[in-house]
Design a protein with these regions (language model features):
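Hydrophobic alpha-helical
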Residues: 112-131, 216-275
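Flexible loop/hinge segments that line or gate small-molecule binding clefts
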Residues: 122-159, 273-281
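Hydrophobic alpha-helical segments within soluble ligand-binding/sensing domains
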Residues: 152-178, 226-227, 292-309
């Protein structure tokens, strides 16, 4: 066969008979052929660019810093193949900053963009514009099913909720009062938390233990504003278990640690952040569920690299491992 035919098979192009294609694939497998990635990168250098759109890190939570750490690792690794990667930040409490970031992005040329879809409707519009410009998209952290062209890499939110329910079953007794707590400013933009809560409810309802479940929102980030809300909820509900649906579990733990006059509930929350681990080590938090945010950004870049440089298939759903940390094992854990 000709070199051109082999090239068409290697790059998954058309105009090759199925018999010839299979024969070439068998030879490739037999001789363990690997493409010369550095040579291939020369052909795409100066026109292969990826963008990342994520929230900037905040003082209240270092979650997005972990995600950025993984992205920076990917930038360091994949830039050697001639790939240009640029990160665009927005404030997850201000929709206009997302619009501004994506406008700057669209003023440049990119082959693909990694998106943390905090603002659902705005993200849908942005993805629609990307599609019109032939820019591939992939989501991290949370998903909007059916909208990204290259899939989703992040936690299975429903399963994390079910896991939290499973952990609650070890802490709560029949008829226990359970407070499901959403803590964040701009909670209307955290729709994905509802998926966690759905999984949590479903698991506990299947147990038929008559748990008393209450879902409450505290739409603040500052502890001085959160503290009186927690004080009110505690006296109103007297919870046996508190399930914090995001990474702000340290704020809740701080409240119960400082207010010795109130009865301390069991606490479950998310993410391997220093502030959370501090209270886990003190026994104020019973369980942390970790979703490896640092891996999400890195794997998304790796996915784009494999698609554009290795010519591998796309449309991937990559669910992150779900890790459980306790006071006894956190010291051995690495994100």
């Amino acid at each position: 066969v000709s070199i051109a035919t082999v090239d068409r098979v290697l790059n998954n192009r058309k105009d090759v008979s199925e018999a010839t294609r299979q024969k070439i694939k068998d030879i490739i497998k037999e001789y363990n052929y690997q493409p010369n990635l550095y040579a291939r990168s020369l052909s795409v250098k100066n026109n292969l660019s990826f963008a990342v759109v994520i929230p900037r890190t905040s003082l209240e939570t270092g979650y997005w810093q972990l995600c950025l750490d993984g992205i920076n690792k990917g930038i360091s690794e994949f830039s050697s193949f001639g790939i240009f990667i640029e990160v665009f930040f927005f404030d997850q409490e201000a929709e206009q900053t997302f619009h501004d970031a994506t406008e700057r992005l669209l003023s440049k040329k990119f082959n693909a963009v990694i998106i943390a879809p905090i603002f659902i409707e705005e993200t849908k519009e942005f993805v629609k514009e990307c599609k019109a410009r032939n820019i591939h998209t992939i989501f991290i952290n949370s998903d909007i099913p059916g909208h990204s062209s290259m899939g989703y890499i992040g936690p299975d939110l429903y399963s994390t909720g079910k896991l939290a329910g499973n952990l609650t079953s070890y802490l709560g007794k029949e008829h226990s009062k359970v407070l499901i707590l959403n803590v964040a400013k701009g909670l209307e933009n955290y729709k994905y938390l509802n998926t966690k809560i759905e999984g949590y409810r479903d698991y506990l309802n299947e147990l038929n233990r008559a748990y008393q479940l209450e879902v409450k929102d505290i739409p603040f980030n500052n502890y001085d504003e959160i503290e009186p809300e927690l004080l009110r909820l505690n006296y109103e509900l007297r919870p046996d278990v508190v399930f914090v649906t995001n990474s702000r579990v340290s704020i809740v733990a701080k409240f119960f640690h400082e207010h010795q006059e109130v009865s301390k509930p069991h606490i479950i929350g998310f993410d391997f952040l220093k502030s959370n681990v501090d209270y886990l080590s003190k026994g104020c938090v019973d369980f942390l569920i970790c979703q490896r945010p640092d891996k999400q950004g890195y794997l998304a870049l790796n996915h784009l690299y494999r698609y554009f440089l290795l010519k591998e298939s796309t449309n991937e759903f990559k669910s992150m491992p779900i890790d459980i940390l306790t006071k006894e094992n956190y010291a051995f854990y690495e994100n």
